[in-house]
């Protein structure tokens, strides 16, 4: 648990330094900062760092790869399709802030590195570690879901407004429960990221709309697309490493 919580603390600190303090996600013109935030805080610390912790814990026999969300390729393909489908439904049912296709592509690409890191750190690392530490109690998945969701909410204090308030922490903890339900039932990291990213997309686009900068996302932003592609590659590489 100490190692898992250390990863969480380092990731939250990096998030504040590269996103929360400079208000990166509210500044569409800050392409360099967005790339730095995506690469350092999310890819290196969140995905790669979190993945290495999962690999370490599985090698020590403290948890299984499947329990952390790294099952078979077939499970992953099915879960990812379900994650995209359910995520799209939830996005539409909430009254989407935008249906502009380019805005959706840019927004999805912008939040993907963040969503991947959130799922890796809060659920694959901390959630799985909590569940393993409470076994063989039947309530272990419930306890893990509650802890992971609460930490997901608290982590947003390191973000830009309007996410860095205790009201948002409470609301996002409830959102985290939906992600917990998807992960602990489906046990797949890729599907959970797809579902979670759709939830994050709604929140980020709404915040951009309230800030009056959503229109700037109507042109494809190549740095965002590149960071999303790198994120997918990193997730697949870490998944292969854990299962090797």
Where would I find each of the regions flagged by the language model?
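Juxtamembrane cytosolic interface motif at the C-terminal end of transmembrane helices
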Residues: 52, 90-94, 235-242
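Loop-to-transmembrane helix junctions at the membrane interface
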Residues: 66-73, 189-194
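Alpha-helical transmembrane segments of multi-pass integral membrane proteins
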Residues: 6-12, 75-94, 111-118, 144-155
């Amino acid at each position: 648990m100490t190692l898992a919580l250390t990863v969480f603390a380092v990731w939250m600190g990096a998030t504040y330094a590269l996103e929360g303090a400079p208000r990166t996600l509210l500044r569409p013109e800050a392409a360099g900062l967005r790339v730095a935030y995506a690469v350092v805080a999310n890819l290196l610390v969140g995905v790669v760092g979190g993945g290495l912790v999962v690999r370490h814990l599985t090698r020590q026999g403290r948890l299984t790869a499947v329990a952390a969300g790294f099952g078979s390729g077939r499970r992953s393909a099915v879960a990812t399709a379900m994650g995209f489908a359910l995520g799209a439904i939830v996005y539409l049912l909430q009254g989407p802030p935008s249906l502009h296709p380019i805005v959706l592509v840019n927004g999805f690409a912008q939040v993907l590195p963040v969503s991947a890191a959130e799922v890796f750190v809060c659920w694959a690392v901390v959630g799985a570690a909590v569940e393993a530490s409470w076994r063989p109690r039947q309530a272990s998945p419930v306890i893990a879901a509650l802890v992971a969701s609460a930490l997901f909410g608290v982590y947003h204090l390191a973000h830009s407004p309007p996410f860095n308030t205790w009201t948002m922490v409470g609301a996002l903890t409830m959102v985290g429960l939906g992600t917990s339900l998807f992960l602990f039932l489906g046990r797949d990291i890729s599907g959970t990221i797809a579902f979670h990213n759709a939830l994050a997309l709604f929140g980020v686009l709404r915040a951009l709309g309230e800030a009056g900068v959503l229109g700037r996302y109507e042109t494809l932003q190549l740095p965002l697309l590149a960071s999303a592609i790198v994120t997918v590659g990193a997730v697949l590489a870490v998944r292969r490493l854990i299962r090797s």
